[in-house]
């Protein structure tokens, strides 16, 4: 009788562990899918932009509707197209996407984001490993060729997934 109890207990333990692992994989897959949707929104916003700016701090709204001068890199990206304005903001743990058009404002939050390391997490021989907390690496930057880049990592219970979005705004194509 004791043998049956041990076998049933072990089988139950294995089953619970497998279910926990499956739940972690499903949560990771859902989080990755959310960030894939964010990358698609960001890509569409960049490529259809008739005006854009990158900011290090929260942008001020100009009274004439034009975007205030920005920076070459920062944690804010504002894209204006014919349908409205899309703002992306990284706050250290999530990316917020706010879309404004025809007077309506839609805000979505994408949790689990962290800064991408400039060397894809692979330290040089004289560097300490980057754990995604590099506060000096903004997620948005503008190259000398006019290419906007958004780069971040998504940290799941299973792994860390890098996301990169590149695009040339409509006005520069």
Label the model's feature ranges.
Residues 1-43, 47:
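Aliphatic-rich helix starts adjacent to a transmembrane/signal segment
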